[in-house]
From Swiss-Prot:
Entry GO MF terms: metal ion binding; ubiquinol-cytochrome-c reductase activity
Annotated gene: MT-CYB
Note: Heme 1 (or BL or b562) is low-potential and absorbs at about 562 nm, and heme 2 (or BH or b566) is high-potential and absorbs at about 566 nm.
Main location: mitochondrion
GO biological process per UniProt: mitochondrial electron transport, ubiquinol to cytochrome c
Name of the protein this chain belongs to: Cytochrome b
Chain residues that bind heme b b566: 97, 196
Organism: Rhinophylla pumilio
Membrane topology: Multi-pass membrane protein
Taxonomic lineage: Eukaryota, Metazoa, Chordata, Craniata, Vertebrata
Cofactor binding remark: Binds 2 heme b groups non-covalently.
Domain of life: Eukaryota
Protein task: Component of the ubiquinol-cytochrome c reductase complex (complex III or cytochrome b-c1 complex) that is part of the mitochondrial respiratory chain. The b-c1 complex mediates electron transfer from ubiquinol to cytochrome c. Contributes to the generation of a proton gradient across the mitochondrial membrane that is then used for ATP synthesis.
Residues that hold a ubiquinone according to the record: 201
InterPro entries named in the record: Cyt_b/b6_C, Cyt_b/b6_C_sf, Cyt_b/b6_N, Cytb/b6-like_sf, Cytochrome_b, Cytochrome_b_C_euk/bac, Cytochrome_b_N_euk/bac, Di-haem_cyt_TM
Amino acid sequence: MTNIRKTHPLLKIINSSFVDLPAPSSLSTWWNFGSLLGVCLAVQILTGLFLAMHYTSDTATAFNSVTHICRDVNYGWLIRYLHAIGASMFFICLYLHVGRGLYYGSYTYSETWNVGIILLFAVMATAFMGYVLPWGQMSFWGATVITNLLSAIPYIGTDLVQWIWGGFSVDKATLTRFFAFHFLLPFIVAALVIVHLLFLHETGSNNPTGIPSDSDMIPFHPYYTIKDILGFLIMLTALSGLVLFSPDLLGDPDNYTPANPSITPPHIKPEWYFLFAYAILRSIPNKLGGVLALVMSILILAVIPMLHTSKQRSMMFRPLSQCLFWLLMAVLLTLTWIGGQPVEHPFIIIGQTASMLYFLIILVLMPITSLTENYLLKW
């Protein structure tokens, strides 16, 4: 008698995706982040569902409803901080996952990579709208500043902004629609994750060497299930540590003040995971130019497969490209730091230099370095 997991219409799909899936034997810890992102998404949907049971999306009561969750709901403080810090964990895993793809050349699976970029945009949109919901000072002013950027679009910009706001300023209509979209988007993300996996399983996983591994495959279960569970434990320990010991470490103190349209905070800034893009936006004095640079800072990922000039897929055996990759990481960390600083000397020039380097490394230096390595290896 054949095993039910191999014959049942539903179970055999799960079996071929998570149990009997042939996987390269050399996958390192950098391949753990896909499953960690799945756990993050599950945690966010669950905690978000419980928060939505108590939250009210009205400008008069939104801030108080969040306070009520933290003070009066059983373990409401725990659910709220798991959700807030869970978002930070989500982005840490997301950026490491994308970084892994860049380093090991996973972007050559173009369908998987492109769905991944759409996923990144969807998660960023979800996080932005979620940050508006507590209706604190930074929520309100963050929403005002970021949505107002769309007014830089020629001809339709102003109408578009008013359409998104549902009026002439960020108000009740804006908060209500942001809550509706913030609730809906994670389920769209979950559907896109299935598409992402579907495309990945068409080709099979990449591996650290970038060399086809068809001759050396092992079953996903038990080898990588055990490895993934270890990853879950480490991440959930870090999440619990932050939630229980320093829940406000990654937040902004201004968000403990109710939204007030007549008082502008001294430094308007988004959550830490958007600071690199915010720094690129601020480094260009022109509004439309800044918006284009902001969008391109993420959309540039779609161009990377076309700029792959190396004869090797992975950077594992390419020391010059490795140096450039880590320089790019240093530039991104610098941008993240600059995004949280006030707009004054010397932060302005540092931000502009780092922004220029970011695009220069990806668009010019990496392809040239790859060609140089080909030449040095006489390929």
